[in-house]
């Protein structure tokens, strides 16, 4: 990495639902596409159509009617490395149009992930893509960088996993990190179920994508769930209609806030877990008593599942109810929070002080994949 001046590091935030990729120093990711690999359900009959045996990302999304869609990442953990390799290949060569052997690569992962997951990521980057250097950073820590803070508790909720990470003066407090395997995809599944009760059937992997779109466009979080339910029974003010791809129009009312309510009441989908407000509170309570005040005053939301309207107010209300009465509570919801992990990665990879943190290919060749645990937090 001697002539590191003209080489921009690549930042790749591999989410369960979306891949966000781009160049360090940019203020937004260049490529954002679904983490999907699709394989044809039918056999091709027309010669010369150039049919592929696998489609990745947006192309898989647009041809979803004839494909079986698979997500290689579930709950933040890669469960299909061949497909994951296809996604990275697509990211580097088709989306960013770069040669990975010429750029250091910064990858992200969820906290409390299995060690093997991180080692395999390292191995693929060095052995398959021949990266000159790489680094694996924790997603929530990057979100805090992006918000310009060094102290705070980050609630990062994406498509596959939510986690709370308290950070004090730049140090993550690993004993207080909590992870909740409840996130956007579970909400989409919950909405599929609720809509089935209404007589609309969504079953295939392609139809799940339609429901995800309904969720993203129409769902919101009620400040007072019970009261909102009462209102929805008597008035039709919250009903909205959505046009399906085939032109059929469906109306959704109470489903709009029933679906994301699962974040606060996981028992609604039969999960025995604390909601996001309680998880955040529990995480703060695991920290030293002297720093709790700073954490309560800097609760930072990040990730796509925190994009629901009303989430910051509700979060504030729920945590105020749990915390000591005199405590000042501030929930920060930056407008760019959907991409704040990526933005934080872009900031981190372009810091001059970060340059000695990279794992170089030579170090990898010497020690093997386990080096990632020594060099990355």
Curated annotation (Swiss-Prot):
Domain of life: Eukaryota
Keyword Cytoplasm: yes
Enzyme Commission numbers on file: 3.6.4.-
PROSITE patterns with a match to the protein in the record: ACTINS_1, ACTINS_2, ACTINS_ACT_LIKE
Keyword NAD belongs to the record: no
InterPro entries: Actin (IPR004000), Actin/actin-like_CS (IPR020902), Actin_CS (IPR004001), ATPase_NBD (IPR043129)
Compartment list: Cytoplasm, Cytoskeleton
A cellular-component GO term for this protein: cytoplasm
Enzyme class: hydrolase
Keywords, in A-Z order: ATP-binding, Cytoplasm, Cytoskeleton, Hydrolase, Nucleotide-binding
GO MF annotation: an example: ATP binding
Main subcellular localisation: cytoplasm
Catalyzed reactions per annotation: ATP + H2O = ADP + phosphate + H(+)
Pfam families linked to this entry: Actin (PF00022)
Task performed by this protein: Actins are highly conserved proteins that are involved in various types of cell motility and are ubiquitously expressed in all eukaryotic cells.
UniProt similarity note: Belongs to the actin family.
Name of the protein described by the UniProt record: Actin
Organism of provenance: Gossypium hirsutum
């Amino acid at each position: 990495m001697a002539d590191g001046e003209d080489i921009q590091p690549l930042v790749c935030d591999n989410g369960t639902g979306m891949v966000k990729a781009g160049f360090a120093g940019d203020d937004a990711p260049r490529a954002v596409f679904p983490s999907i690999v699709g394989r044809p359900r039918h056999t091709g009959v027309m010669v010369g159509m150039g049919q592929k045996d696998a489609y990745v990302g947006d192309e898989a999304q647009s041809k979803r009617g004839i494909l079986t869609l698979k997500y290689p990442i579930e709950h933040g953990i890669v469960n299909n490395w061949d497909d994951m390799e296809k996604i990275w290949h697509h990211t580097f060569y088709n989306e960013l149009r770069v040669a990975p052997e010429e750029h250091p690569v910064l990858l992200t992962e969820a906290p409390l992930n299995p060690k093997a997951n991180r080692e395999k990521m390292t191995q693929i980057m060095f052995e398959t893509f021949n990266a000159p250097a790489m680094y694996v950073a924790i997603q929530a820590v990057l979100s805090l960088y992006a918000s310009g803070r060094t102290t705070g508790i980050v609630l990062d909720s994406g498509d596959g996993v939510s986690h709370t990470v308290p950070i004090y003066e730049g140090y993550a407090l690993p004993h207080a990190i909590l992870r909740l395997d409840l996130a956007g995809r579970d909400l989409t599944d919950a909405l599929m179920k609720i809509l089935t009760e209404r007589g609309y059937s969504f079953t295939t992997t392609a139809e799940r994508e339609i429901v995800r779109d309904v969720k993203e466009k129409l769902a919101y979080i009620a400040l007072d769930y019970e009261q909102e339910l009462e209102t929805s029974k008597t008035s039709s003010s919250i009903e909205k209609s959505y046009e399906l791809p085939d032109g059929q129009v469906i109306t959704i009312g109470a489903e709009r806030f029933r679906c994301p309510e699962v974040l606060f009441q996981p028992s609604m989908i039969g999960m025995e877990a604390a909601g996001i407000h309680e998880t955040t509170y529990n995480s703060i309570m695991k920290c030293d008593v002297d720093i709790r005040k700073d954490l309560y005053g800097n609760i930072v939301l990040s990730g796509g599942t925190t994009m629901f309207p009303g989430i910051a107010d509700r979060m504030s209300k729920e945590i105020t109810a749990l915390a000591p009465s005199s405590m000042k509570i501030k929930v920060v919801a930056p407008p760019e929070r959907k991409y704040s992990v990526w933005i934080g990665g872009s900031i981190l990879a372009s810091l001059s002080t970060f340059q000695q943190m990279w794992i170089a290919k030579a170090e990898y060749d010497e020690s093997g994949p386990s080096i990632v645990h020594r060099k990355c937090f």
